[in-house]
Amino acid sequence: MGIPMANRRAPIPMKVLMIDIGGSNVKLMVSGDTEMRKIPSGRELTARKMVSEVKAATADWDFDVISLGFPGLVKDGRLVREPLNLSGGWLRFDFQRAFARPVRIINDAALHALANYEKGRMLFVGFGTSVGAALVADSVIIPVELGLIPFSRRNTFMSRLTKEARRQNGHKRWQRDVFAAVLLLQDIFWPDDTVIGGGNAKVLDPLPARCRRASNLDGIKGAVRLWEGADRLAKPHGTTWRINMHPSRSKPTPPPHALAQVA
């Protein structure tokens, strides 16, 4: 005899910890909660130190798996080179062993693009300690490393559009440069939708034309979408991520204890 419908229980969803590594802070959230915690980042932050501080900051949180947004190039879910704005020791670090949880890694701009994507072509640009971007074209996320690309004859995107550039050049000039950069990127990529995020998105007023502002809380949505059972599922393919907009709902979510086993 089958179990009566009234007594059947839906699969228990996995709890996903988001670790979003920025140049100034590492943002932490867990799925199902709106609380965000932060730990300091910067040029002294090693992978080992990050893990230690994340463990301390999340000691009272329950989670089964981890999504890690990394400020640099990621290929097939693995780090390709050391980050520009952090200390070293990241490339060969075993995050799964250190956390004793399954870990999936994604470029940080791609994480937020995944969170905000709806359809068609979408451009995400993040302005903060650094400058990051990702284009989503027909459900394929393509990170764009903008930082060292020339912005003018003597400047790069990094030297004109970061938090430090705003401090040195003043808000008005910085905002003018941001508008010019966004217009340039829109002319190059022809997005249907442009999303502005990063730590400095909140001080852009008004926004550039044809843009919307991302919320700081959006990242957890992208973190969840790296794991089976989400409303959308993104899987790495080289240096891109392919989004399944309609993942099968019939496949049950694996129990957390099974996913937490690390080979």
Enumerate the predicted regions with their spans:
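Short glycine-rich, Thr/Ser-proximal phosphate-binding strand/loop in the N-terminal lobe
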Residues: 2-52, 140-168
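Glycine-rich phosphate-binding loop and adjoining helix at the ATP-binding site
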Residues: 42-55, 59-67, 72-121, 160, ...
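Helical "lid/coupling" subdomains associated with nucleotide-phosphate turnover
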Residues: 149-183, 212-222, 227-238, 263
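Long, low-complexity, intrinsically disordered segments
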Residues: 249-263
